[in-house]
Design a protein with these regions (language model features):
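N-terminal leader/targeting and accessory segments in enzymes
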Residues: 1-87, 91
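Walker A (P-loop) phosphate-binding motif
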Residues: 89-100
Length: 100
């Protein structure tokens, strides 16, 4: 993945974040999280990744996107994490010029 700046991501998802970092990976599962990635807390039928946000930071996530404030964690808060993921994909795709 090409690098994205957290400031670009925050703007794309209509959120705020006061730290800057280059993101080269996005994770939705702390079991496969790599240091420096962006963790997005998705909710499923049997899980809520918001429960794992502190663990994501412990494992080295550069930032997290959540749908609510998490105690002792500075996150980018949005209304819908799935929409935020879509908006990031749109931002990323627009960085490239396709060959036709």
């Amino acid at each position: 993945m090409e690098k994205l700046l957290l400031s670009e991501i925050a703007k794309a998802i209509n959120s705020q974040y006061h730290k800057e970092a280059e993101i080269t990976e996005i994770c939705t599962d702390t079991r496969s999280l790599t240091e420096g990635c962006l963790f997005i807390a998705l909710k499923g039928e049997r899980f809520d990744a918001h429960d794992f946000v502190p663990k994501a930071f412990e494992l080295g996530a550069a930032a997290c996107i959540t749908e609510k404030e998490i105690e002792n964690c500075e996150c980018m808060v949005v209304d819908d994490c799935r929409k935020a993921l879509k908006d990031i994909a749109h931002l990323y795709r627009n960085k490239f010029t396709p060959f036709l």
